[in-house]
Amino acid sequence: MNPTPKPMTFSYDHWLGNYKVLLIFMVVFGHLIETFRNLDGNDPVQIVYNIIYLLHMPAFIFMSGYFFKEVRPKRIFSFVVLYFIWQSIHEVYLAYVNEKTVDGLVDGLLHPLVPSWTLWYLLGIIIWQIVTPGFLTLRYPLLISIAFALLINANPGSITNFLSLQKVISFYPFFLMGYLVKERGWLADGRIRDRMTSPIGRLTGLLVSVSIAIAMAIWTKNGFDTVWLFYRDTYGEFDVPVLKGALIQLFLYAVSTVMIFSVLMMIPHRSFGGRFDQIGIQTLAIYLLHSFIVRLFRDSVPPWIAESPVLLIGSSFLLALFFVWILSSRPVVRLFRPLLSSNVNWLFKKTS
């Protein structure tokens, strides 16, 4: 994900780029409907939300791992600077809308390592890039990453919000999986990719994806707790035994993994034009900017829309399309470029 505009080149992978477009749309769409999913009569909203969350962050993080190349200190530090910039912006914004005192604002600014809402992902990118080389020296890196995720959630009490470690560790297997898939060349041009994007492959992806969506809808109607998909609470907080909690988490890992590939199989691999491709390039910019628009949307939705599943889902869907299109535009990215791309060259010694 690159927050600065750049021209398309022949090396741009339209198949994976189109997938990123879908995923960032799902991120925005899911956040738009999030607040209203628990309102009376909004069961369809809850179902749509759960289906989105079963896929969008696991797949988004999978793609981040897929495009991870190597540990580059400058890149890591640029994400660190980016995180502190946006964490400060969030704190100032929240202090304003919540009418916090100056002391409240200062207190928030002095606790920057408890990320605000969506910013846990930036911390995740930083930590995942740092630890991945170490995991790759292990014989079974993916299995060990899953074991770590199960262990941290087996803690009987609540885990600290510091660095959003629980979410970062719990989602790490998807990042590592993305990297390992790339290393094995499974999604590169070749036999596997040809089979995945063949008519039979696309039909298979459609049938599997629809089946999972229907199953999630049924599970939601039967009391599935959406919070499981956030990977932020321990088994103890769900009041379930460790073994049952671990099995649920493993099951969700498996279903999300299947859905990552089944949805990918349906994605067109042709270009829809440079402007559409620009969305895939600007996913990080959209991710960072959309949270403020979403908050404004939540505060301004009239009750007659919020309490109507059809109107809420329909309007949120159209607004998500609009926001993704606008936030990825060159004028918007150019306007916010100082906040989207941090130059950290001054931190490093000059090499001769």
Predicted regions and their residues:
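Alpha-helical transmembrane segments and their immediate juxtamembrane cytosolic regions
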Residues: M1-S352
